[in-house]
């Protein structure tokens, strides 16, 4: 059995405690949480099922395919969190800011718009390709002396005592290993192995929808505008992306690449994945000329949409985090940003625990964390479901109500700042 502590590393000068954390799941949330802990001087080991690629600064600088990636909208609060740990300068060159947000419905009079000048903010957030975000986070983790990586490892068991939590995992060489620490944080996705091993149930709701994601090119520059469009074909979101070689935040290089998220009925996605012309023409029909002409699409992917909420997020010395705790509908782009706020709060609480000389796996403190995050989580979950229901329901009365609501939102000055702050993650 391996017990992970700062002593396991050659105790870097910024390590403030011999207590440590195991993070299962090395996606964007797991990688980010490890970096948040390291910034606080807390050591961690990240255990990931898949094998990581060997990357370095030279390989990292190579551009991914011009029209081939999934993307994430980073709220202003998420950007602030990355700024706090000194990582945003690395991320910013591959992120594209959102200066304006437009919401409308095809064939209806409802329309609303948010502008950064009106709200007196630098931007509402940033859009970044998942490939670049993952590479930058992984590179930062690999270079951090307080973070150890174990990849190609499948967790098979979780055990707890009064003072430690232990995971057992199988390696790619079919060798069984164990690892112990003061706390385990499970960031291993919607179908979380750790959550299931602990017997934590979930509340699931199948929306009967699929999300088609991809990157398109238009003949009109995006000008840093994000567009949410509700059409009979389903909700459509088009977000600005960096250009092929340029900096997406350079006003002189407003690009022509846009990220697309299209919510359609389950079963309809196959035809749009296979037929680029059909995909582009249907997008055009849904958007009109608001985004210009859609002239090219990259490889597209699709995944079914199901809301998954863990019955509890703390079990002994284990915290359930990220999509393992709450997998949400992507229509409002809030899922990853909610996870980042969770991670930021927990890292801060663990650091405070260390400064008091107390156990970072103390269940009472972890229960306090779960309670502290409930309000924000419930608000975001309700908002996502309200948008899905409100803008997909065919009832004429509901359609009229949502159009009136859009107009009211656009015309009432006191409401806009409130909604903008919620969307940016600055107010919960």
Annotated model-derived regions:
Residues 6, 348-428:
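C-terminal helical "tail/cap" subdomain of flavin- and related membrane-associated enzymes
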Residues 191-226, 236, 264-268:
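Central beta-strand plus flanking loop segment that forms part of the substrate or channel wall
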Residues 24, 38-68:
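Glycine-rich FAD pyrophosphate-binding loop
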Residues 270-355, 361:
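FAD/FMN-dependent oxidoreductases across multiple families
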Residues 113, 231-303:
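Conserved FAD/dinucleotide-binding core of flavoprotein oxidoreductases
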Residues 16-18, 76-84, 89-197, 205-210:
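Conserved N-terminal helical subregion
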Residues 30-31:
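N-terminal Rossmann-fold NAD(P) dinucleotide-binding loop
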Residues 14-27:
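Beta1/beta-strand and adjacent pyrophosphate-binding region of the FAD-binding site
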């Amino acid at each position: 059995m391996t017990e992970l502590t700062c002593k396991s590393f050659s105790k870097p000068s910024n390590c403030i405690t011999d207590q440590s954390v195991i993070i299962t799941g090395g996606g964007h949330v797991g990688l980010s949480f490890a970096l948040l802990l390291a910034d606080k001087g807390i050591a961690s080991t990240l255990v990931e099922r898949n094998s990581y690629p060997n990357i370095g600064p030279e390989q990292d600088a190579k551009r991914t395919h011009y029209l081939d990636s999934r993307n994430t909208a980073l709220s202003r609060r998420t950007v602030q969190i990355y700024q706090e740990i000194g990582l945003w300068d690395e991320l910013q060159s591959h992120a594209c800011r959102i200066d304006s947000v437009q919401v409308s419905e095809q064939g209806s009079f409802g329309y609303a718009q948010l502008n950064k000048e009106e709200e007196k903010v630098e931007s509402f957030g940033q859009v970044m390709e998942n490939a670049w975000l993952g590479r930058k986070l992984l590179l930062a983790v690999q270079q951090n002396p307080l973070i150890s990586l174990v990849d190609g490892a499948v967790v098979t068991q979780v055990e707890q005592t009064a003072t430690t939590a232990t995971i057992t995992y199988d390696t790619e060489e079919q060798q069984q290993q164990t690892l112990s620490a003061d706390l385990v944080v499970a960031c291993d996705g919607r179908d979380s192995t750790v959550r299931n091993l602990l017997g934590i149930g979930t509340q699931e709701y199948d929306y009967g929808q699929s999300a088609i994601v991809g990157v398109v090119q238009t003949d009109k520059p995006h000008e840093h505008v994000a567009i949410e469009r509700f059409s009979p074909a389903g909700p459509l979101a088009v977000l600005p992306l960096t250009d092929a070689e340029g900096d997406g935040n350079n006003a002189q290089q407003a690009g022509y690449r846009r990220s697309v998220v299209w919510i359609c009925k389950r079963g309809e996605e196959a035809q749009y994945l296979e037929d680029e012309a059909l995909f582009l023409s249907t997008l055009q029909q849904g958007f009109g000329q608001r985004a210009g002409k859609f002239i090219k699409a990259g490889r597209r992917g699709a995944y079914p949409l199901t809301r998954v909420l863990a019955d509890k997020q703390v079990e002994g010395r284990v915290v359930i985090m990220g999509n393992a705790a709450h997998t949400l509908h992507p229509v409002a782009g809030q899922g990853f940003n909610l996870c980042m706020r969770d991670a930021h709060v927990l890292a801060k609480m663990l650091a405070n625990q260390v400064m008091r000389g107390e156990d970072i796996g103390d269940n009472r403190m972890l229960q306090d964390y779960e309670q502290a995050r409930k309000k924000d989580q419930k608000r975001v979950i309700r908002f996502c479901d309200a948008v899905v229901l409100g803008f997909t329901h065919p009832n004429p009365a509901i359609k009229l109500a949502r159009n009136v609501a859009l107009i009211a939102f656009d015309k009432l000055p006191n409401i806009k700042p409130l909604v903008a702050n919620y969307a940016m993650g600055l107010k919960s």
